[in-house]
Amino acid sequence: MAEHKPDIMYGTTIITVRKGGKVVIAGDGQVSFGQTIMKGNARKVRRLGKSGTVIAGFAGATADAFTLLERLETKLEQYPDQLMRACVELAKDWRTDRYLRRLEAMMLVADKKITLALTGLGDVLEPEDGIMAIGSGGNFALSAAWALVDMNLDAETIARKAMDIAAKICVYTNDHFTIETLDAELSSLEKAI
């Protein structure tokens, strides 16, 4: 288990669901500082790029996450319509740059083709089933989404219900959600069905 540093802002829940030709990223609005709620309506999910064709959500230290989002936007300008390449290049920088190496954040990013998680360890991970969650309530949201994915629900409904469950369990997650949706290609599992 990671060491809890009281001077760093922790906790949030971010989930992504790709289903039925849609991809959704949802996040809560709570910003915590140690054991204190500092803000309840933060916007941790946003559109990136000039055309808004990439959506991203972040968990971890807020200032660090904004730094990484800015860097990702720069990479997306260098590699337009190549989200995987932009994320891999960002991950390389994140691991090798002395300043970036200390940033404590994770991100979920998606475009119409792919969903990825980026970690401070330099990982760029793609979920095999189109669902992924990060943050202190991530495991609660992920479990809920997996339970709901086979039901006749769309991606946004699954994400919203999963976030509701995480908000009821995780003290670092509230029920003020920001949700962004894109039209998407079918996931590999959906194509196989």
From Swiss-Prot:
InterPro entries: ATP-dep_Prtase_HsIV_su (IPR022281), Ntn_hydrolases_N (IPR029055), Proteasome_sua/b (IPR001353), Proteasome_suB-type (IPR023333). It catalyses: ATP-dependent cleavage of peptide bonds with broad specificity. Its EC number is 3.4.25.2. It comes from the Bacteria. SUPFAM superfamilies: N-terminal nucleophile aminohydrolases (Ntn hydrolases). The active site is at T12. Na(+) binds at A167, C170, T173. It is found in: Cytoplasm. GO terms for biological process: proteolysis involved in protein catabolic process. The keyword Cytoplasm applies. The keyword Protease applies. It is an enzyme of class 3 (hydrolase). Keywords: Allosteric enzyme, Cytoplasm, Hydrolase, Metal-binding, Protease, Sodium, Threonine protease. Allosterically activated by HslU binding. One of its GO terms (cellular component) is HslUV protease complex. One of its GO terms (molecular function) is metal ion binding. Protease subunit of a proteasome-like degradation complex believed to be a general protein degrading machinery. A double ring-shaped homohexamer of HslV is capped on each side by a ring-shaped HslU homohexamer. The assembly of the HslU/HslV complex is dependent on binding of ATP. Belongs to the peptidase T1B family. HslV subfamily. This is ATP-dependent protease subunit HslV. It comes from Bartonella quintana (strain Toulouse) (Rochalimaea quintana). The gene is hslV.
